[in-house]
Amino acid sequence: MSNAPILLTPGPLTTSTRTRQAMLVDWGSWDRDFNQLTASVCEQLLAIIDGSASHHCVPLQGSGTFAVEAAIGTLVPRDGKVLVLINGAYGQRLAKICKVLGRTFSTFETAEDQPTTAEDVDRLLAADPAVTHVALIHCETSTGILNPLPEIAQVIQRHGKRLIIDAMSSFGALPIDAREVPFEALIAASGKCLEGVPGMGFVFAEKTALAAAEGNAHSLAMDLQDQHAYMAKTGQWRFTPPTHVVAALHEALLQYNEEGGLPARHQRYQDNCQTLLDGMAKIGLHSFLPAEIQAPIIVTFHAPKDPRYQFKDFYERVKAKGFILYPGKLTQVETFRVGCIGVVGAAGMQAAVDAVAEVLREMEVLDI
């Protein structure tokens, strides 16, 4: 494993030896010990948002998108309407989920380098009283842009609407307090800022809303109300759980708390991000976003203009030096992305910058 490249991606990401070793034990899915493991994971997750009084944590097999679809399908009534706020590819995915599920929706789209504002949402909700829910990406992974969640949440509450937050790339690293930020659902996953492995999503669902959602869901497997009710009654998952993923997440959460919890995780990622931004600027590579809206999760960089730069060649050369980067996901300009999360510190980020600089020299890329 020592020769494995460092994943500078937004997840899956580089995990610790302890987290990987936790997957070497096999668990019985109905066994009391595994049920206790699941309960412990949910309890620790709720503690991160101070949400135990107001929300249930409902785990779900699959990727984060599975959990997002389950949240929308379970909590938005068949006759509800969702306002989807979009400034990147994952906001577009929210709209696609609503379309596939047959939920009425409208969209509000801003440029990929422009956060949605609370004023935008205030105006949109005043103009369309039929909206019941607003769906928002907290940190839009296609760029790394951070949308102003607390301000938007307060506007939505003032209008008497309900908020669904895709916090896939922010949960565990950026502060979200359920006592201060009103939301009906917040969705995240095991393989992001918690530094577990992929395979389990989870939804923090407001207790009364979840109880009232019986019969809403479009799917048996993705019915969060039924999943929670069964877990509350039996302690078990309804269908085969990702036992090794849960065990790895439990171990990752122990390390999360040992590190110092959210403040320490946020600080490390912030240090990683600053090291990356400073180092790349010195070699002429500049970030797509201004600093004030850049989340310390993933950074989008403008690609060099030099025709000798080709991303596939660049990617393979950087990979050979021990780092896996991420392709750009923007429509208007050519970019590439570098993640700041995972089991890596500032020294690792500087090593990645050095590798990028060396590769660009090897490729004789001059026009950056």
Curated annotation (Swiss-Prot):
Pfam families: Aminotran_5. SUPFAM superfamilies: PLP-dependent transferases (SSF53383). Its cofactor is pyridoxal 5'-phosphate. The modification N6-(pyridoxal phosphate)lysine is found at K192. It comes from Pseudomonas entomophila (strain L48). The keyword Membrane does not apply. Its EC number is 2.6.1.37. Homodimer. It comes from the Bacteria. One of its GO terms (molecular function) is 2-aminoethylphosphonate-pyruvate transaminase activity. Belongs to the class-V pyridoxal-phosphate-dependent aminotransferase family. PhnW subfamily. It catalyses: (2-aminoethyl)phosphonate + pyruvate = phosphonoacetaldehyde + L-alanine. The lineage of its organism: Bacteria, Pseudomonadati, Pseudomonadota, Gammaproteobacteria, Pseudomonadales. Keywords: Aminotransferase, Pyridoxal phosphate, Pyruvate, Transferase. NCBIfam families: PhnW-AepZ, PRK13479.1, transamin_PhnW. Involved in phosphonate degradation. This is 2-aminoethylphosphonate--pyruvate transaminase. The gene is phnW. One of its GO terms (biological process) is organic phosphonate catabolic process. InterPro entries: Aminotrans_V_dom, NH2EtPonate_pyrv_transaminase, PyrdxlP-dep_Trfase, PyrdxlP-dep_Trfase_major, PyrdxlP-dep_Trfase_small, SP_NH2Trfase/AEP_transaminase.
